[in-house]
Amino acid sequence: MTQEPFREELAYDRMPTLERGRQDPASYAPDAKPSDLQLSKRLPPCFSHKTWVFSVLMGSCLLVTSGFSLYLGNVFPAEMDYLRCAAGSCIPSAIVSFTVSRRNANVIPNFQILFVSTFAVTTTCLIWFGCKLVLNPSAININFNLILLLLLELLMAATVIIAARSSEEDCKKKKGSMSDSANILDEVPFPARVLKSYSVVEVIAGISAVLGGIIALNVDDSVSGPHLSVTFFWILVACFPSAIASHVAAECPSKCLVEVLIAISSLTSPLLFTASGYLSFSIMRIVEMFKDYPPAIKPSYDVLLLLLLLVLLLQAGLNTGTAIQCVRFKVSARLQGASWDTQNGPQERLAGEVARSPLKEFDKEKAWRAVVVQMAQ
């Protein structure tokens, strides 16, 4: 009987100070359960088998058709220049299709501008073919080239229709039941360093391509063609706005800037690939130049065209990568519960953090009252 008070006192001393005032310790529940503290890859993915199959199939068909079109357009460089342009414009759509197939979300609607701009380029190439056929019917052999051109047009039309009919509502419904676990995840990081590096390389590549285009225009007036003027124009249009938008979005990311950057990159990427496809005939000329040894000095004009082609490909790849990075950030922000429609300020974010842990604030107050009572006793 005499040892019972000492046992109670010993047990009371072992109890933490902040836990003494709790009336019902068993009813305490932590804010985050171990099952909730999981990485995003452990969350049930918003996966669509139809989207995956469509993306892989469409990307494969576009790559194969574009490859055959580029080869045939380089075999007949003067007669099938429209085929090279159409094939080049479809390359970013193929890249985006494979990127979509690797994601666990339906991100096809976010590339709608890119698909529409590519479809506009292929339609223009089809009209170009019709005009050449009307002006000189005997010079054009309607054969496999028309089949490839129509196939590219149909593939892009199907992509545009599917992208227009796709939506992210199903994905949002699947993610709706996971809002509690998504709130504890960290905010989605914006790829600022990647976009800044892209913008620097884009400016350097654009200036180099502009200087190369000016030099190529002044090499020989007899060999200068309209393709150089068109390429020169699209370099000026595509390079600097995209680089400036990338740098500004990396400095202060917001919904408006990300959407503008996606739109600019989606518009300029197919156009740059179109110009690259048109200039791809310089590769065959360089190969023919090195067949005979020693190579002739006169075809140095083709070397400039090849360098211009490489810079255009670099610029087009950076624009496509920018669009993919921005869409990836946008989709990740939506799926992880971050606010995309409205930008939260610091006060709203702090209020949200306090609202997430009401039990902690309540327990601290009760514990402080318990400490005051014990000190008074």
From Swiss-Prot:
Residues 1-23 have a biased composition (Basic and acidic residues). The modification Phosphoserine is found at residues 177, 179. It is a multi-pass membrane protein. InterPro entries: Membrane_MLC1 (IPR033280). The chain crosses the membrane at residues 52-72, 82-100, 111-131, 144-164, 199-219, 230-250, 257-277, 304-324. Residues 1-36 are annotated as: Disordered. Changing residue 309 to M: In a pedigree affected by schizophrenia. It is found in: Membrane; Cell membrane; Cytoplasm, Perinuclear region; Endoplasmic reticulum. Its main location: membrane. One of its GO terms (cellular component) is cytoplasmic vesicle. Expressed in the brain, with highest levels found in the amygdala, nucleus caudatus, thalamus and hippocampus. Keywords: Cell membrane, Cytoplasm, Disease variant, Endoplasmic reticulum, Membrane, Phosphoprotein, Transmembrane, Transmembrane helix. Changing residue 125 to R: In MLC1; accumulates in the cytoplasmic perinuclear region and endoplasmic reticulum; affects interaction with ATP1B1. Changing residue 246 to R: In MLC1; does not affect subcellular location. GO terms for biological process: caveolin-mediated endocytosis; cellular response to cholesterol; positive regulation of intracellular transport; protein transport; regulation of response to osmotic stress; vesicle-mediated transport. GO terms for molecular function: identical protein binding; protein-containing complex binding. Transmembrane protein mainly expressed in brain astrocytes that may play a role in transport across the blood-brain and brain-cerebrospinal fluid barriers. Regulates the response of astrocytes to hypo-osmosis by promoting calcium influx. May function as regulatory protein of membrane protein complexes such as ion channels. Interacts with ATP1B1. Part of a complex containing ATP1B1, TRPV4, AQP4 and HEPACAM. PANTHER family: MEMBRANE PROTEIN MLC1. It is linked to Megalencephalic leukoencephalopathy with subcortical cysts 1: A syndrome of cerebral leukoencephalopathy and megalencephaly characterized by ataxia, spasticity, seizures, delay in motor development and mild intellectual disability. The brain appears swollen on magnetic resonance imaging, with diffuse white-matter abnormalities and the invariable presence of subcortical cysts in frontal and temporal lobes. This is Membrane protein MLC1. The lineage of its organism: Eukaryota, Metazoa, Chordata, Craniata, Vertebrata. The gene is MLC1.
